[in-house]
Amino acid sequence: MWGACLLLLGLSLQVCPSVIPVEEENPAFWNRKAAEALDAAKKLKPIQTSAKNLVILMGDGMGVSTVTATRILKGQQQGHLGPETQLAMDRFPHMALSKTYNTDKQIPDSAGTGTAFLCGVKTNMKVIGLSAAARFNQCNTTWGNEVVSVMHRAKKAGKSVGVVTTTSVQHASPAGTYAHTVNRGWYSDAQMPASALQDGCKDISTQLISNMDIDVILGGGRKFMFPKGTPDQEYPTDTKQAGTRLDGRNLVQEWLAKHQGARYVWNRSELIQASLNRSVTHLMGLFEPNDMKYEIHRDPAQDPSLAEMTEVAVRMLSRNPKGFYLFVEGGRIDHGHHETVAYRALTEAVMFDSAVDKADKLTSEQDTMILVTADHSHVFSFGGYTQRGASIFGLAPFKAEDGKSFTSILYGNGPGYKLHNGARADVTEEESSNPTYQQQAAVPLSSETHSGEDVAIFARGPQAHLVHGVQEQNYIAHVMAFAACLEPYTDCGLASPAGQSSAVSPGYMSTLLCLLAGKMLMLMAAAEP
């Protein structure tokens, strides 16, 4: 029992000895680990060539506390104690902190932050792809204030480009790669005021297919691409999932007509088939009417995981000998936090790290720069002096001043603020372990808010050593542009990667065989009576 192995006196804590691995009781264990890390650090040398390929993976709302909690959860899922586990992003040798504020807000949103790290310019809250001279919801402040994304510059340089997300592809973060809008909510013309349409502003879905030639588009957001009332392919009887467009345009058909080798898919099976067909040069996969399902609710036979979408994108984009730019978003980490349902947020973050692992293993650090970061953090914390190895979703080992139990994970505000008979609920282990449990919050809000602390940047590959110290968030875009010698750094003076080989690493064939095996199993299952 906790009373037998936990002594809480002020800030002192004694952990039950049975929890501590025996080898960790010996100072030599820690000295050896530190010496190994020191040796690796001394051997670390910057890769001073240019980057043929650029990959940025962004965990929406993945603040440092979320990264740490994800590390613990991943370890516990693997049967370990948790904190000692290494995430894929932890393997990257270079890192920095990013200051996330918007030009007008101390606590930022995904539109302003996305514009910063994707375009290289900070801007106002709720504004995408425009400078801070633009004003939210004022259409006439759009023109002349556009800023250009690194992805757009990569395309101009002849590289292939792609966008992958677990949200809708019109969401503020992916939209930062291609759109210019004074309102992040203008997914289709149905969300826009008549005055904005009359003034010539375009909805984000229209900009997705018209602003630039994107080779791979994978995520959710189907209903914003089709005329109002068009039945959804997956949910034909659910009118809430039907098309929303008032202009009668079928943007998917318009996009297909632009490219001879274009393919549109809406489920995992079609995605795998299309990705293996080398005649497919452009791929759009929209797997849900709006955001994709949480990982814990995903039907693996119907919808691809973020890791699978990342693999498909890398494989297709790698066909271009001039290289590629890829943006990957683990977007529903943010949504889980807004709901104060930590189980959803952290399981999404574990899947996001799997996508990082895919990108890392499918590419070479000699020619591919990979950056992993977040747009902002959340008022998410975990504490309470829990025992090492205790569930990240579990209770603190002592009672609060009101005599009731509390979870290690708590939120500063949000819908988790609930009173029962005028008092805080006494939560149980069974309740806190439920995947739908809302952690308690200090202040009642319908949706938990972002927070303002710095977020981490992890980097590997050519010029990754430039990711260092504490930087403004827009620095990220400039590092990536410089590494690939893109505008405005075309005279970067960097040598090309040795050999200019394909980005896909030797381990790629094994993952391809796994995809093929999965497809065969699906076909066999479908053939059974």
Swiss-Prot record:
Result of knocking out the encoding gene: No visible phenotype. Mice reproduce normally, give birth to live offspring and do not display any obvious phenotypic abnormalities.
Disulfide bond annotation, renumbered to this chain: C139-C201, C485-C492
Bilayer disposition of the protein: Lipid-anchor; GPI-anchor
Cofactor(s) the protein needs: Mg(2+); Zn(2+); Ca(2+)
A single Gene Ontology CC term: myofibril
Signal peptide limits: 1-18
Chain sites annotated for binding Mg(2+): D60, S173, E329
Regulation of its function: Inhibited by L-leucine, EDTA and heat.
A Pfam family assignment: Alk_phosphatase
Annotated GO MF terms: alkaline phosphatase activity; metal ion binding
Further remark: In most mammals there are four different isozymes: placental (ALPP), germ cell (ALPG), intestinal (ALPI) and tissue non-specific (liver/bone/kidney) (ALPL/TNAP).
Name of the molecule in the record: Alkaline phosphatase, germ cell type
Species assigned in the record: Mus musculus (Mouse)
Gene name per UniProt: Alpg
